[in-house]
Amino acid sequence: MTLTSRGPRPVRAIVYGVGEMGSIVTRLLVERGVEIAGAIGRSTTKVGRDLGEVAGLGRRLGIPVEADAAAVLGRGADIAIVCVGSYLETMFPHFAACLENGINVVTIEEETVFPWTSAPARAQ
């Protein structure tokens, strides 16, 4: 099954965070035919390496993990899958950067499911 956006082209996604969860997300995106437009990470052991290697795919994807989030987001995508934290208050700047670049946000962060109890000001 290939995920597509409006029209005949595949969804373009940015993997924002390349730890364990970002690696799982990468594998799922590749399996489903999503076009990976970029990868953002901060670990010095991962930045500069190929996303396929970092995610344990056993092959290169031709997508380098980059530390400069603004540069990656500035190149555009349909969505960013944000996998870099657990709390809305600390995640908000990452979400805002995506949205400011016209990129929709998908996240695994648990607090975003029902933020009204833990981050009511941000939930508004």
Task: List PLM regions with ranges.
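A short hydrophobic/small-residue beta-strand
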Residues: 104-106
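Rossmann-fold NAD(P)-binding glycine/threonine-rich loop
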Residues: 90-92, 96-97, 109-124
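N-terminal glycine-/serine-/threonine-rich beta1-alpha1-beta2 phosphate-ribose binding loop
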Residues: 1-101
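A secondary-structure boundary/capping signal
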Residues: 17, 108-109
